Amino acid sequence: MNNRVHQGHLARKRFGQNFLNDRFVIDSIVSAINPQKGQAMVEIGPGLAALTEPVGERLDKLTVIELDRDLAARLQTHPFLGPKLTIYQQDAMTMNFGELSAQLGQPLRVFGNLPYNISTPLMFHLFSYTDAIADMHFMLQKEVVNRLVAGPNSKAYGRLSVMAQYYCQVIPVLGVPPSAFTPPPKVDSAVVRLVPHATMPYPVKDIRVLSRITTEAFNQRRKTIRNSLGNLFSVETLTEMGIDPAMRAENISVAQYCQMANYLSENAPLKES
């Protein structure tokens, strides 16, 4: 038997398709999302509707974004969901969530079992729309969730941790084994809740500067910041900010990265591209 076939659909590797089929896990996720009528619920990658059906049962309207043409067509003719759905057959990476929020007249509640092959770039895409998003609930590779929630002085802490925590409060919800999917992925999964900050705890003047600093620091994470960020900051400047130049990228807090970004914005701003 081909374990890539589920409900008559052949899972496509190029779309990173693994279909959720564990009822306990599905119920736990829907309970964590707690969808309510009248909310602007948006699902990314509904697939074979494992989450779409129980969420849709509680709603009058649901927006879904599905890249796979066959799956989008199945949803359109779904016996009870079809009339409730607004279906965008496109890549979520090309979706303007700000425009979608404006259309729906309120901040979005976004959820989904994200394809693991695009989960990190998709997270960065969504971060750029956090002013249009109320919250997000995603199934991700467990290793990615560990990175999202990691704090300084840990191996999992990296650029994704800093940028996610800059924009959102990040809360792990539950772990999910490979056996909950068809076909089973080779890795463990986990569900995470991301709630955009109502007030930024460490606002930066130019997000591009924070992005640049974290990229340069974590691309050379074994080096001290005296070396990895030496082209941006002198030892004296770091010391004045109360940041030890002998620290590595993984030792620096989100607040300190934001402090460095604001110093650079004031003293050596990026040119407009």
Curated annotation (Swiss-Prot):
Enzyme Commission numbers on file: 2.1.1.182
PROSITE patterns, alphabetized: RRNA_A_DIMETH, SAM_RNA_A_N6_MT
Binding sites annotated in the UniProt record for S-adenosyl-L-methionine: 18, 20, 45, 66, 91, 113
Keyword RNA-binding tagged: yes
Keywords assigned by UniProt, alphabetized: Cytoplasm, Methyltransferase, RNA-binding, rRNA processing, S-adenosyl-L-methionine, Transferase
GO molecular function: 16S rRNA (adenine(1518)-N(6)/adenine(1519)-N(6))-dimethyltransferase activity; RNA binding
Pfam families linked to this entry: RrnaAD
InterPro entries (UniProt xref): KsgA/Erm, rRNA_Ade_diMease-like_C, rRNA_Ade_Mease_Trfase_CS, rRNA_Ade_methylase_Trfase_N, rRNA_adenine_dimethylase, SAM-dependent_MTases_sf
A single Gene Ontology CC term: cytosol
Subcellular location field: Cytoplasm
SUPFAM superfamilies assigned: S-adenosyl-L-methionine-dependent methyltransferases (SSF53335)
Top-level lineage group: Bacteria
Principal localisation: cytoplasm
Catalytic activity: adenosine(1518)/adenosine(1519) in 16S rRNA + 4 S-adenosyl-L-methionine = N(6)-dimethyladenosine(1518)/N(6)-dimethyladenosine(1519) in 16S rRNA + 4 S-adenosyl-L-homocysteine + 4 H(+)
Function, in words: Specifically dimethylates two adjacent adenosines (A1518 and A1519) in the loop of a conserved hairpin near the 3'-end of 16S rRNA in the 30S particle. May play a critical role in biogenesis of 30S subunits.
PANTHER family: DIMETHYLADENOSINE TRANSFERASE, DIMETHYLADENOSINE TRANSFERASE-RELATED
Protein family (similarity comment): Belongs to the class I-like SAM-binding methyltransferase superfamily. rRNA adenine N(6)-methyltransferase family. RsmA subfamily.
Protein name: Ribosomal RNA small subunit methyltransferase A
Lineage, highest ranks first: Bacteria, Pseudomonadati, Pseudomonadota, Gammaproteobacteria, Enterobacterales
Encoding gene per record: rsmA
